Every structure is written in C-alpha cells, then in structure tokens.
C-alpha cells in the first residue's frame, strides 16, 4: 500500500487572521510499507533494493506493518528492504519535550553510522511519534520502522494504579506505560566507552577509531603497535619495519586521510565528478549509478564513470559548512561475458558510495581599469572559481550575454552590469551575496576598500539589484568609478557568496539583509562557516595617459 497523506483542515470565518501552523501530530504522512520493518531482510530475487528518495522534509508516522516507531539501535545492513538501513541514534522524547532533534544513522559495511543526518521527532498524545525526515544524500537508504514489545496487553488505563509494567533489561517503559522501548546506554556517560559507543538492541558496544583497538576491558582503546595486531588497523596491506608500520593499497586505490583505509580515487571537478575504478575490483561486474542509465566505461585498466552534479541521480545537499554531492556506484554480475574478456566474477556485488564536498562560502574577484578622461574603459576578463560560482561582466541589464573574448569599452559613470553565476544550475540550493567590495589592487586584504554590499545589504545607494529566475544567480548594476589618486588605475571587485538549502528557513540566506543591530538573533551565522578564497587576475592591460 503506498504512503497516504493525513491532513487536518482548519476553517475560520470572520476577519482574516494569520495562518496557523498545523500540529505534526495531526498532519503527517503514514509510512506503512511492510519492507520498512527491521525484521524484513533484503531479498534481491524479489526486486532491487529500495530508496527513500521521495522523502523530503515532511512529517511522517510509522503505522501498519512498517512498525510502531523508528528503532533506536543499530540495524544490520541489508535490512528494511535496502542496503543501508537508517535508525534513530538517540532516545525518543517525552510528550512534554515538544519537537526535538536527533541524529539518524545509516548502517553499512560494518559501520553503524557510515552516514548521518539530523531529523526532528515529536511525541504525540496517544503514545505515538512523528518524525520530520530529510532526504538521504545517496541511495540505497531507507528509514526503518520497528515493532516494540508490549509488556502486558492488559495493562492499560488505570491499571497503573494497582500494578506496574516491567520491561526486560536493556529496555525502558514508554510514555504510554505499556510499550518497552530500547534503552540507549550510550546517552549516559557515552556508555563508559573511551571513544565510540554504538547502541544495539537491548545492549551496546564500545568501538575505537582507525588505528586503535579495544583493550581487554571492552571500553578503553589503545594504539595498534604493529601489523600483528588487527592488521595494524589497515583496510588492506600492512607493511612492518623497524621504525613501525604503514598501510599500503592495491594498485589503483589510494590511501585516505586516515592513513589506514584504501579508497577508490574520486576527482571532484567544478561541474562534474569522475570515478576511476581498477578493473581488478570489478571483473565480471557491470557498474552503474543511482540512475541505472548512467554506466561505467572500461578503458582496459579502469572503469571510468563521469557524471555531472545534476544528473544520474546525484543528490546535492547543504551539510554544515559544506555543499555535499553524493551518488552510489553499484556493481552487479553481467548477464553475458564482456568484450574485455570478463568470464568469471570474484564478488557478487560491489557498492561504492561517492561523495564530493565543496565549501559553502566563496570570495570571487574581478577587476576593471577606469579612465579619468572619459576615454574607453577596459574591463578585465573573467576568472573561474571552484564550484559553484563565477563573477561575470554582462553587456546589458538582460544579464544573458557576458563578455567572453572581446573586452568592453565603458566610461566613468556608465553602467557596469555584473553578476554571480552558478557553474552548474542545481535545484534545492540558493545563494546570498553577503558582501561585495572594491579595491585598487587584486589583494583581497587590501586596506583601501569600498563596500557595495555588506552583511547582505546594499550599502551604496547607486547599486541596483535585479531579480533572477535562478535561486543561485544574483545580478547587479553600478555606475563605473575609480579610486582617488593618479596611481589608482585599476579597480577590483570581490564578492563573498554563501550557499544554503532553499528549504532551510533558519539559514543565513533566508535571513537576507542582516544589519549589525540584528546580529545575535536566532538562525544561522555565516561567521562560523569555512570560507575559500578564489583568486582572479589581474590580466595586464596597456594603459595610455
């Protein structure tokens, strides 16, 4: 049975009033598919793994055969009808707590929290829960449901006055005084673990970071001393020496930043992602992305997959101070031998999550050369930055045709049309030009600055902003000017651009113009975001006095 929408309608007569937000306990989407339940193991003979790519920030309630609520313990992979089941890493709230935030984790490849996101939870009157679930960044992820034990079916209503339901060790009594929920031991002093605590069903376990192992007490960690101990923490080969040891990777793989894990090399370009997988890993397998029409191409030694940020099922999301683009490479046995001579297979399935991260905050520079004598003004050529923006100089206020090869000719006080343009037009994102300032040199930290935009507000009355159909593009008009002094013959523009999720009502982009008097109000502050400076020019231009 497909999910259905339960809505409560509110009719008000008389004078107009402000809109009333519906209580999520009475306005939610039911998730009732049997395959969501934690008892449902993935059987690909009955169909491909499932994915919650339709989930997109709405409120949901688990009902029917899906279960009563989300599990609060680690679910093994290949359950809930998918490869990477998603569970709630935290206890359910009480009714008086209102809406709370919890971490949701996806289990895969032996890691109970290989991927995580933040969801919202509310306890409703009647003893059930509703969840505001975010869209997973990659497939195959599914939010799981679970049937919790009933301690005594006859224990209901006033029976609590005469007797008390008791739950098994590792579980606690729920707000309905009847259901036994899993106890999250990790919420109390991290379960006594010195590093990582993983909540399990009716229990928990301690884990250690890469290159470290548990001591005999099962709670504290120690450094790996050599290859004889857990292979040195290396995912593949461990090479010992008199001075210690180091991890090595098979040909075609690269060592990740933790210096212990080997991974497939991924090239994050400004408008595309490229994955090169050694053929030894994929012999006999056919590789494809989330959109199965996007497939790998073999060059004899590697299988190459090239895809853009808005095709092949790529999911682009804003996570903290980064823009994250994700996809999943899946390898399944070929139906017939390939032209490259693959007659055998050594694995039944290959799954490679692919992620590229880009900073949210950018500083983009562009320059021009003003002429005091009202003779032609030459605009410096544009400079590309890293994903996702460039600063373009346009020919008119239609902002459709930027100057490409031929430089424009302008005079002082003529109109200069410039704009922030995304390299790739990705839906679900929006931008805010937080500041734009001019300098007489290409240095961003130049002492002499003239602000056109500051704190998201136009600070020069001569600046005009135009509306754009694209949430990421911003267009402006300003009269051409120069700095005082005969030596100041160049002007450079620098713009700080911030990227946000278009549905995030508390983001810095949603706040817009942010005067200093408003700082400290609720919502996101871009001061804590990691920024990246994109250098541009200058291109030297002959100057005639």
From Swiss-Prot:
Pfam annotation, one family: D8C_UMOD
GO cellular component, one term: extracellular space
Summary of the tissues where the protein is detected: Liver-specific. Expressed only in the hepatocytes. Down-regulated in hepatocellular carcinoma (HCC) and HCC cell lines.
Subcellular location: Nucleus envelope
UniProt xrefs under InterPro entries: EGF-like_Ca-bd_dom (IPR001881), EGF-like_dom (IPR000742), EGF_Ca-bd_CS (IPR018097), ZP-C (IPR055355), ZP-C_dom (IPR042235), ZP_chr (IPR048290), ZP_dom (IPR001507)
S-S pairs: 186-197, 193-206, 208-221
Domain of life: Eukaryota
Domain named ZP: residues: 261-516
Chain positions covered by the region annotation Disordered: 518-545
Cell inner membrane among keywords: no
Residues of this chain annotated as glycosylated in UniProt: 89, 116, 291, 299
Name assigned to this protein: Oncoprotein-induced transcript 3 protein
